[in-house]
C-alpha cells in the first residue's frame, strides 16, 4: 500500500488571496509597514512558535488540511472495530468470547494500523513486527511534521532536538509479551512507552531530551507543555511533541464499559443532550515547536504562537476519575497568566468534552467561569467552544494534541467549523447565560482590532486527575516575511533545479508521480522557484537521487511524468550517492576548441554573475587585443585564434562564476592548456586581472604563428604516437589526452603528411580547429617576448584550494604561476592523462568540464575507466546550441545526485519555500505479530496444557460403562513445557501418557501399559481417551484424515485397569540405599548422557541435585521444577519424566537411545508431590532392559511405584562420546609453507622503546645491503606511513621484570600501532609484525592479540614471530610466510600452528602426572569459584572424592546465618549449590578475594592461615571476564580490565603456590581455544589466555605439572550461556562445537594422565561439507569432511562458477549475495539496496553469523567474522568476493 503524507497540504488563509495559495502566508496580516516593525519589536522571548504539524486519524485523515476539510463537512469517522484485532483474545480462553460479545466493539479506528514503511527507516521486518504500531505511527507522523515545518530531518542529526510524546496504551505489549513462547529480543524497547519518543530520537540521531508522558487522556497536551517549558528554559532548541493511541486489545475498553464511560454506539456527542459516553479513537498528532524569534530568523512558517500552558491535578475528588471544576478553572487561569493575555481576548475554546453526562457540564461550567460570563465579556461577543472528538473520537493519549491542531487550524482560517453529532444542546448546561457558543454552522470569527490577534484555548484532562491547558495566538507578523515570498510569474521564470530523492530505488515512480499530480492540482498557483527551494533546502536528500531541470511548470510536469514511467529525459538526471563523492568536485578548464558563435549570449542576459565577469574583462580585452568582448558575444565569436583565446578565457571565468553561484566552489581545480589561466584564478593563484593579461598578451604573440600550424587528434596513445613521428621533423605530441588518444601538433605540412599516412593505416585522425602549433618547440621563439610582456605584471600567490598542473611532470607541484610557468605552459606538452590519474589516486571521482562545449570530458572518462573500477562522473557545463543555464544546472544536478555537496541544498532563510510541496510518500506493508492460539470452539473442547495430561472434554457414553475424553493436540497446547523431539518430530513424553491414565482412572492403578506408537504433536491431531472398567486406550488421528472415518484412527497406547492403588512398599530408607551406592555421578549425568545419545531437549524442567549409583542401581535427588516455570499445575508428571529418563541411563555402559515401551504396573498414592523427591531405579531380573522405579519424598514416603518398565533401543544415530576421541588436542608446529614470490618491503620501521634500541641496531645491520631502508620510532603516531610504497612496521616489545606491566604495556602498544595504521589511507601497503621471544613471559600475551589481529585485519597483519634466537632478524619469515597469525622460529625454520590429537600416555609410563585423583585429606582452590564454571568444577571434584574446597571470588555471599532466607536468583543458586555439596559431606569455603588485586597474595595467604585447612593439593584458575571490543574500539582501561583477572590473578597464584610446592598435585589454568581460532572482538580475552598457556609451559620447565586447558564453550554455562545463539553460531562458523560438562571433565582427566602435556585443546571439529572451505588453517589436520553425496550438485555449480570472470562473475556474485541478504533479513530480493550498509538494513550480530555461513556455503570460500564490518554493503561484498574468486 502506498500513501502520501501531504500531497494536498495547502493551508489557505481566511483572508489570503488566491495568488498566495500554497505558500506560508499567515491568516492574519497587516498592510501597515509600521505595524510590522512593532511586531518585531514586541518581546517574544517567552513565545514559542508552532512551525509544523501533522496527524493521522480515523476517517482517512492523514494531514492537517485533510482534517480541516473533514471538520468543515462535520465528518464522523466512527464505525465497527476490525474484528481481527480481538481474535487472539477470543482464542485465549473459551469464556472470552461471551465477554467480548458484550464489550463495545465500535469507535474510531484507523484502517491501516498494521501498515508501516519499515524499509524507509531501515528497520528489518523482524524488528518491525515486534514494534508497537504506536511507535510506527508516531515515527511516520513525526517525519511528516518535520517536512511540514520545512526541516530536513538530516539537518537535526546530533542536534539538541527533544521529543516529548504522550502515550497511555500498552495493548500491543500485552498482546505480544503474554505470548511467552514467541517473545522476541526487539520487544523490550519495541513495546515500551519510552520506545515511542526514543525510536524517533534514535533514528533521527537527536541528542535532546526524549521522554514518554503518561497522564492518561491529557498526555499529549502535557507533552506539549513540557516541550514548551524546555524550549523556554534553553534546555532544547527544537521540540517534537505530540501523542499517539492505538486500540489493539479489549482490556481497557472492557474497563471503561464497566465504568459506564463509553457510549453504546461508540460515538462522541460533545455538548449534545443525548451524550452518554465517548467513543474511543486512535491515531497520532505531532507539532514542531521552536522559539518564535529563532523561527523568524530561520525563515520558518509560523502556524501559531504557543503563548502559555499549564498542568495541574484535580486533587481529591469524589473518585479518582471524577472531574473537578475548580481544578479546571484554576489551570485555565494559570495558562492565561503564563500567556499574559486576558480571558476575554480568547475567541475559541477547544474543549476536552468527552461526551459524558457528568464531564461535559462540569467542564463547560468551569470554562464559562473563565472565558464566558465570568470573563466580563459582552453578550454580543461570545466565546465559541467546540471539540474534535465527535469527528475523530477520543484519542486519549493523543487527544490533547489533536485539539491543539484543530485550534491552530481555526486561527489559521479564522473560522470555527460546525460541531459534529450535535442535534440538541445539552440541557444541563446554561448556554444562554454562560456566553459560550458551540458552532452549529460554519462561523467566521470577528477580527477585532489589529492589536488583538485571534486567540484560542485548549483544554485536556486525564481520568487520573491531570488537567492541562494551553493558549495559542494567530501570528500577525508572518505577513512581513510573506513579502519576500512574492510569486514569480511562471512565464518569466528562470530555469529551476528540482531535486528529488528516495531511500530505495523503487520509490521514485510514486514520488515523481505525486509531485507531478500536485503541480497539476496547483494550476500555476505556486512558482517553480518556490518548489525548487523547498525540495532542495527543506527536504531530506536520500541515497537515490534525481534532478530535473525545468524552465516552466508544464516542462517540470512532463519530465516528472517521464521519470515516473522510467522514460529517459534530456533534462532528468538519476544516480545514487556513495563514498566516492566524499572528496568533492574537480573543475577542469579545457583549452582551445570549445568555441561556437553564440556561446555566451544567453548567459550575458540571464545571469548577473556572468555579466559581471564580462564587464570586468571588457576593458582589459579592449585595451590588450583591440576588440569588444560584449560586442563579440552578440555578434558571434570570430574564427581568429587570438580572439578565440580571449573569449575562451572569458567563457571559462563566466561559466565558473555561474557554476559557483549555483553549485558552490570546487574542491580542486585543474586547467588544460589555455584552461590553466582560469584554473589559476579560481584557485587563488592569480587574480582575474593578472590571468587576463597572461591570456591577452600571449594571444597577441600568437598572431605571429597564425596560419603556420595545425593540430590533430589521433587515436593512438602518446607513446605510440611519439614512436611513429620520431622520423617526422616539424611534429610532436602536444597533448596526452587519454590512454588511447593524443593530440599531435606541428607545421601544416608535417601534420598533412602524418594524417594521410595514418588514415591509410586505419588510424583515426581528426583535425583540431586551430592554425597555431600549440605546445610544440616551434613556439620557443615566443618565450622571450612573453617573459618580457609579463615582467612585473604577475604576483602569484599560494592557492587557497587544491590546484593541479597539466604542464609539470608532478601535477601536485606547488610551483608558483609566475611568468616562467606560463612560458612552460605555452611550449610543453599538456599532460592531461597523468594529471587526471593523479587526481583519481588522490580520491577524486567527480569531474566537471568548465567550458562552452565539452572537448575533454571523453578523455577524462577514458583515463578514469583505465585507472579504477569505482563509480565516477565526468560532466560538461555547457553543450553547443543547448540552453546554457539549463545545462549548467544539469551539471549541478549530476554532482548532487552523485553525492557531492552543492549550494542549492544549503539552508537560506531568505529564500521562499512552501510547506504544501508534497513530502514523503509511504510504501506501506503489513507488520503485525501473529499471536499463537486456537479458536474459541477448539479451546472449549481441549485439554488443559498445564495439567500435563491429554484429558479433554469428558463424555459418559449412554447405555455403556464407557467414558470418552476428546481433545485436539497441536504445538500451541502441547501438555508439557519443554521440548521432546525424536528424530526431528516433537512427541508427547511417556510420563504425560502415564499421567493421563492415572488421572482418568484415579484412584485406581494402571497395569499392562503398552506404549505402541508415539503421539506426535504436530501437525494437529484429534485425541480420544476411552476407558471402561477393564481397559483404557489412547487413539489419535490427523485432523485432515477424514477420508475413512474409522481406519484413520491410530492406537497409540493401551493399558488395563488395576484393582487397587497400593504400592508394594510404603517407605524407602534413603540413607541406607545411598550407603550401598559407591559411585558418585555428576548432577548433569543423566542430561549429558541423554544428549550424547541423541536427546537434544527435555520435556520437563527437572534437575538432579545429587546422583549416586552402582552397576544395578541409581538414586537421584530431583528438583521437579527448580526454576518455578509456568505450565505445570502439579509436579508429578515432571517427576515421572525424570524417573523414565534416569531409569533409561541404568545401561549407560552400553550407550544407545532407549525409550519405555511397556510398564507392568503404575500406582500413585494420591498425595501432593513435593518440590524435591528421590528417585530409586533398580535393574529388574529380566532378559530385556527393564527397571523398577520408586519415587519417594525426602523423608522416604513412597509417592509412586513403577514396576517392570521395559526399554527398547531406538534406531537412529548414536552420539555417545564417552571416549575422548576427537575431543582432546595439542598444538603442534610443523614447518610453514613458503610462498614462491616474496613480499617486497621498501622500508622497515621499528617501533620500540629505548631499552631495545641496541637490538634494533643489530637488526639494521642484518638488513643492510638488501635495498631496504629502516627507521626507529618510539611512538606509533610518528610512523612514516605515507612516505613509502611498501612498508613493514615491526613492533619490538620492551623487556622489564614486572610481568603484568610488561604484558599490558606491550598489548597496548601493539593495539595503538594497529589503530594508527588502520586510520591511514595507505594501510593496504603496510604490514604490521610483532617480534617476541618465549623467554620473556610478559610478551606471551601478544600471541593471542596477534591471532585476533589476523582475524579482524588480515589486510595489515603480518604475523607475530616468536624467535628462538633474539639476535637474528626474521626477514625470511616476514617475506615468505603468508597468511599466518603466529610464526614460531624453531631450529631456524619458520613454523605455524596446527591442532593434532593428543597422544595418550604409554601404559606403563612413570613420567609426568598420574591420572587425576582427589583426596578427602587435601584442600582444593578454585578462582572464579562462584561462577557457573567454578560451581560446576567444585561439584565434579566432590563426586571424585574432594571434601575441602575454597571458592575464591570477587563477590561475597551473605552471612551463613541468613542463608535460609530468600535471595536474588543468582545468589540463591550459589547458596543452594554449596549446601547441596555440603550435604554430600564436603566442606565448602567461599572466600571473597579479588585475585587480580595487588593485595591478592597477602589476602590469600592470610585466608589460608585463618582457615587452618590441610595443604592445598590442587589449584584451578577459572577467573575471568569478557568484554568484546573490535581493535578500532579498544581502550587501554577496558583491555587491562580483562587482562587483570587472567594475568595478575595467575601470577598471584604462581607466587602463593610456586612450582616447588611439595603438596601441589595439579595447577590448572582455564584458557580458551577462541584465541587459536581468532574469535573477533576478543583481543583482550585472547591475550590473557595466551599468557596462561605460556605460564603453564614456564612452570613445566621448572619441574611443575601445570596444565593450561584451552576450552571450547561449555554447553549452557560460562560466558556464552546468555549469548542468544550468537556464540553457537560463531562456533559453527569457526568449524567447531561446544562440549558438555561431562565431556569437559573427561577431557581434563585424559590430559592430566598424558605424559608431558603442558596444555590441552578441548573442542570438537564439526564435519565440513564436501565443498566447504576450511574455516581455519589450525584445523587442517583434525577437521573431518563429509563425503560428497551421489548426485550432489554443488560441485557442478562450483565448476560452472570457476569458469566465470569479469562482468559475468560479478553478476553471479551479486545474485548470490543479494539472495543471502534477502534470506537473512526476510525481505524481498528487489528491496536489497546494494549501497546501504547491512546494519542499516537491520542485520544484527546473530544475523551476521548466519549470513556469513550462508555466503560461505554458497560461494565455497572462507568468510571471516569481520567481513561485514569491513565490507558493509552488498556492493563492497561483491567487489571483495570477485577478487577472492578470481584469485
UniProtKB/Swiss-Prot annotation:
The macrophorins cluster contains a single gene insertion (encoding for the terpene cyclase macJ) compared with the yanuthone cluster that produces the linear compound yanuthone. This is 6-methylsalicylic acid synthase. It comes from the Eukaryota. Its EC number is 2.3.1.165. GO terms for biological process: fatty acid biosynthetic process; lactone biosynthetic process; methylation; polyketide biosynthetic process; terpenoid biosynthetic process. Disruption phenotype: Abolishes completely the production of macrophorin A, 4'-oxomacrophorin A, 4'-oxomacrophorin D and 4'-oxomacrophorin E. CDD domains: KR_FAS_SDR_x, PKS.
